[in-house]
């Protein structure tokens, strides 16, 4: 997925979930839309460099959207993190189209936002004789042990999606939970039992019932001017359903 224009700034604060104050290089402070309803635990770090996309729509209330943040990493360059949850499905759609996820290759059609019973799942992949349902979850929380965890707060909606996937398996379809790891510093994923034990337990149960769990990590390319130019899912990552964090203290609060 390619960005057409990004402007750097420094995060001052995020507030009211959907708003962020950002200082631009000019010294101006702007209010940007924060397209992330989650807790953004260990990601909402004041003082870090962020990247904003501008809107050319004069009718829009906020002219800026917060897209990315660079987070410090121990003994490594900063990690790039996509905070825009709406980009996760776009990254997965591109990866499916380009056959970058071998486990989900070979399907003729990719339909998005599919209603099943009382839930909506992100993708239905199909051939003439088989179907696979895929639910995408964006992972941005990197805890102090170096692993990525989902969810970053209690998620009843996430549990409902797991039950919907299990119901598809019971009907004879294939069902997949796909973690879209939008943090270049994460190399493995686990359910966040320290934040939402019910979600972790539900995930282990539905996995035992046949729901597949995959994780793919984001990579980024940069322009000659030092601006993020493209992000894509390129890295298959291991998932440990039994892992438990010894301490719930993240790299940053």
UniProtKB/Swiss-Prot annotation:
Pfam family, one: SfsA_N
Molecular-function GO terms, alphabetical: DNA binding
InterPro entries: SfsA, SfsA_C, SfsA_N
NCBIfam families, per database record: sfsA (TIGR00230)
Family under the similarity heading: Belongs to the SfsA family.
Protein name according to UniProt: Sugar fermentation stimulation protein homolog
Annotated organism of origin: Chromohalobacter salexigens (strain ATCC BAA-138 / DSM 3043 / CIP 106854 / NCIMB 13768 / 1H11)
């Amino acid at each position: 997925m390619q960005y057409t224009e990004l402007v750097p700034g420094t995060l001052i604060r995020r507030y009211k979930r959907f708003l962020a104050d950002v200082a631009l290089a000019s010294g101006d402070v702007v209010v940007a839309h924060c397209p992330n309803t989650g807790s953004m635990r260990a990601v909402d770090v004041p003082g870090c460099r962020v990247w904003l996309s501008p809107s050319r729509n004069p009718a829009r209330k906020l002219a800026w959207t917060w897209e990315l943040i660079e987070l410090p990493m121990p003994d490594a360059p900063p990690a790039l993190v996509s905070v825009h949850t709406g980009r996760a499905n776009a990254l997965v759609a591109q990866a499916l189209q380009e056959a970058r996820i071998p486990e989900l290759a070979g399907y003729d059609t990719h339909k998005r936002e599919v209603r099943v019973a009382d839930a909506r799942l992100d993708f239905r992949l199909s051939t003439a004789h088989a179907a696979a349902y895929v639910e995408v979850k964006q992972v941005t929380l990197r805890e102090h042990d170096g692993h990525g965890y989902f969810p970053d707060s209690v998620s009843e909606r996430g549990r409902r999606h797991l039950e919907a996937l299990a119901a598809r398996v019971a009907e004879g379809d294939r069902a997949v939970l796909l973690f879209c790891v939008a943090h270049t510093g994460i190399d493995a994923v686990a359910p966040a039992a320290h934040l939402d034990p019910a979600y972790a337990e539900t995930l282990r149960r539905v996995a035992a019932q046949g729901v597949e769990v995959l994780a793919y990590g984001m990579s980024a390319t940069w322009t000659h001017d030092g601006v993020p130019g493209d992000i894509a899912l390129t890295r298959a990552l291991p998932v440990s359903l039994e892992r438990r964090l010894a301490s719930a203290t993240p790299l940053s609060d």
